[in-house]
């Protein structure tokens, strides 16, 4: 998802994908100016007018609704533009699980964190196109007011999760089962919530939503002309 103030961040993200010959991506342009800029540069993009607020707690229903519409067409892997692919992270996917999520130890949202001691980050998350997964989307989208999609998704999972449906796998991964949906939560290193780490597939540093993403990514060694 991209607005015009994120244009250079989007180009940096695509640069890293191109290094791994990844071409089956699409950036959702939320305004015509952004769409035209990306399209002129042969960057895969789709125009869906909308807005995402740069704060936690609300303003993210548009993203979740758009992901649901895309999910109807096939499996999707949603990735924030400041989550930089150092390796081909498609290798983290499998055919067994319905949702594969990156792990967040930052404490948001608090309800899920208190229950699980971690949360699932919407900044890198795979959804399989099947009825059970779409049913979760539909239940969350029944809420009429705007919301923070990471909060609503995590809260839905813990509200419907039985304690005996939490498993540990090798490499410190977690497996959850909710509503006949198998959720795999990756370990901290594979999608790393920190600065450049050569051991990681993806580095998704913790950056305040109001911060200048370009400046922060450069500081953290995740800009295309810094490595």
Where are these regions (language model features)?
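N-terminal anchoring/stem segment of glycosyltransferases
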Residues: 1-58, 69-73, 210
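Short, polar loop motifs at secondary-structure junctions
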Residues: 29-35, 85-89, 189-192
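Short, hydrophobic beta-strand segments that form beta-sheet elements in well-ordered domains
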Residues: 24-31, 77, 184-187, 203
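Short loop/helix-cap segments at secondary-structure boundaries that form the rim of catalytic
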Residues: 35-41, 91-95, 195-197
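GT-A fold catalytic core of metal-dependent nucleotide-sugar glycosyltransferases
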Residues: 47, 59-130, 134
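Short, charged, surface-exposed secondary-structure boundary motifs
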Residues: 10-11, 53-61, 108-115, 212-215
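Catalytic core and acceptor-binding pocket of nucleotide-sugar-dependent glycosyltransferases
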Residues: 127-227
């Amino acid at each position: 998802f991209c607005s015009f103030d994120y244009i250079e961040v989007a180009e940096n993200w695509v640069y890293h994908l191109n290094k791994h010959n990844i071409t089956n991506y699409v950036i959702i342009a939320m305004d015509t100016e952004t769409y035209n800029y990306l399209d002129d540069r042969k960057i895969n993009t789709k125009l869906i007018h909308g807005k995402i607020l740069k704060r936690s707690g609300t303003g993210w229903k548009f993203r979740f609704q758009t992901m649901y519409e895309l999910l109807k067409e096939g499996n999707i892997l949603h990735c924030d533009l400041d989550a930089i692919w150092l390796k081909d992270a498609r290798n983290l996917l499998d055919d067994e699980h319905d949702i594969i999520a990156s792990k967040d130890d930052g404490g948001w949202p608090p309800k899920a964190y208190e229950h699980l001691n971690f949360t699932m980050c919407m900044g890198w998350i795979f959804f399989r196109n099947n009825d059970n997964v779409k049913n979760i989307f539909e239940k969350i989208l029944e809420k009429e007011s705007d919301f923070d999609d990471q909060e609503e998704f995590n809260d839905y999972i813990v509200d419907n999760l039985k304690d005996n449906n939490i498993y540990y796998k090798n490499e410190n991964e977690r497996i959850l089962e909710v509503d006949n949906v198998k959720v795999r939560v990756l370990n901290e290193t594979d999608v790393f919530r920190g600065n450049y780490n050569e051991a990681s597939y993806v580095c998704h540093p913790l950056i305040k939503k109001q911060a200048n993403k370009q400046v922060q990514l450069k500081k953290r060694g995740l800009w295309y002309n810094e490595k």
